[in-house]
């Protein structure tokens, strides 16, 4: 299915591009499973759920310079706030050429640049913020957005957050501030999978109507009902981009499935932070055959 790129009025992605994105996503799932299995530690559930989104964002939507720089001048920049989904982040960065894919084999090892939660201390290309503590990424992204405005850099800032992360009060200060200051060059995406470490978000602390809350704070809101469909993701991102620089910050509500692509991990918080055993790894890899070559 082809869709319209709302910014350039061209049909995109093509079938060839869609196939490429699907192949990268499948390989990314393999990377995630193998990374957390090797060290018997990590967060596969949310990583799998955001694979399609991050693959599409980095490969088809974001404007990225060939060489990574922390200042991000004259390019779009991305902040991962829910840093526990580092496996998918590292895989996407590696598959985009930020660093060698073989380095994925060092995930969570001592002295590795690929720690369980991303940090800037290791100097890993693509990582702009340490994001172990939840609820801080949006504030930093808003600061970066203001910096771009001051420097007359007409590129965008993206931030990915978890839905359970909205239970952190700092987010709501940031949400209020961004609208009050017309920070209209930011696109914040909320991964709405309805799961967090202790159970469903409804059982832990109900989020209520997230769309209504963001709109009441002065944000434009785009909903992607199938956040695991690449075509829908692309369309939603392009629609979000078309809403930028119009006086309001933009929020995407991305409705994903925890553990998507591995049947026994789907729809449950139990795989928020648990690694598969040998048998489970084999099943997961069979469901996601190698497409780009394993590291």
Language-model features, listed with the residues they occupy:
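Generic structural signal for well-ordered, non-membrane alpha-helical segments
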Residues: 14, 18-21, 25, 29, ...
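Flexible, glycine/charged-enriched surface loops at secondary-structure junctions
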Residues: 42-44, 104, 251, 295
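Glycine-rich ThDP/TPP pyrophosphate-binding loop and its adjacent helix/strand module
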Residues: 63-71, 75-77, 116-295
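Alpha-helical support elements that line or immediately flank enzyme active sites
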Residues: 88-99
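A residue-level signal for conserved active-site and pocket-lining positions in enzyme catalytic cores
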Residues: 53, 89, 252
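N-terminal amphipathic, basic-rich helices that act as targeting or association modules
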Residues: 2-86
């Amino acid at each position: 299915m082809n869709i319209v790129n709302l910014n350039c009025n061209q049909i995109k992605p093509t079938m060839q591009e869609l196939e490429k994105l699907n192949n990268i996503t499948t390989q990314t799932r393999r990377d995630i499973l193998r990374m957390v299995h090797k060290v018997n530690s990590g967060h596969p559930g949310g990583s799998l759920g955001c694979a399609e989104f991050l693959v599409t964002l980095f490969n088809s939507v974001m404007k990225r310079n060939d060489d990574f720089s922390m200042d991000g001048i004259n390019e779009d920049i991305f902040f991962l706030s829910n840093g526990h989904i580092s496996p998918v982040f590292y895989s996407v960065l590696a598959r985009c050429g930020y660093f060698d894919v073989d380095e994925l084999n060092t995930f969570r090892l001592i002295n590795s640049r690929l720690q369980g939660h991303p940090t800037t201390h290791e100097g890993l290309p693509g990582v702009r913020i340490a994001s172990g503590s939840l609820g801080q990424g949006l504030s930093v992204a808003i600061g970066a957005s203001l910096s771009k405005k001051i420097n007359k850099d007409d590129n965008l800032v993206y931030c990915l957050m978890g839905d359970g992360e909205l239970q952190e009060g700092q987010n709501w200060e940031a949400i209020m501030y961004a609208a009050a200051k017309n920070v209209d060059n930011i696109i914040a995406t909320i991964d709405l999978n309805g799961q967090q470490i202790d159970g469903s978000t409804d059982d832990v602390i109900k989020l209520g109507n997230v769309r209504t809350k963001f709109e009441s704070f002065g944000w434009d809101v785009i909903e992607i009902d199938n956040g695991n469909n690449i075509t829908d993701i692309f369309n939603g991102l392009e629609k979000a981009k078309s809403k930028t620089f119009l006086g309001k910050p933009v929020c995407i509500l991305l409705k994903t499935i925890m553990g998507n692509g591995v049947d026994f991990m789907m729809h449950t918080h139990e795989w928020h932070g648990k690694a598969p055993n040998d048998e489970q790894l084999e099943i997961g890899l069979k469901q996601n055959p190698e497409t780009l070559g394993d590291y």
